């Protein structure tokens, strides 16, 4: 059976891995998943990520903790296959009053809500991270 929402699966693996205090989590790789992992790394929510394998690449994300507590408090899928959520540049949400980030898919690639606002772009809101 094929996976209906691989992004939700990725976010759930990160959430469950941190709840179980795992060092890292691995999952099947895809370009969009790697772009999300890159954004999470740039924002400081994960330590690192690697892609290994040729035929079936595997994305391994090294989770980040601060004083034994997970850095990611909440990670929530917004736009999903059954209900896509698009926001214009003026309607992009501020997660936790600006403390968290919304990951947005724009015509110039994946970026945070802050970067999209600076570039004057809207797009599909993939997830919230705080």
UniProtKB/Swiss-Prot annotation:
Pfam families: Ribosomal_S8. Gene3D superfamilies: 3.30.1370.30, 3.30.1490.10. GO terms for cellular component: ribonucleoprotein complex; ribosome. GO terms for molecular function: rRNA binding; structural constituent of ribosome. Signal peptide: none annotated. The keyword Zinc does not apply. Keywords: Ribonucleoprotein, Ribosomal protein, RNA-binding, rRNA-binding. InterPro entries: Ribosomal_uS8, Ribosomal_uS8_CS, Ribosomal_uS8_sf. GO terms for biological process: translation. The keyword Membrane does not apply. Belongs to the universal ribosomal protein uS8 family. One of the primary rRNA binding proteins, it binds directly to 16S rRNA central domain where it helps coordinate assembly of the platform of the 30S subunit. Part of the 30S ribosomal subunit. Contacts proteins S5 and S12. This is Small ribosomal subunit protein uS8.
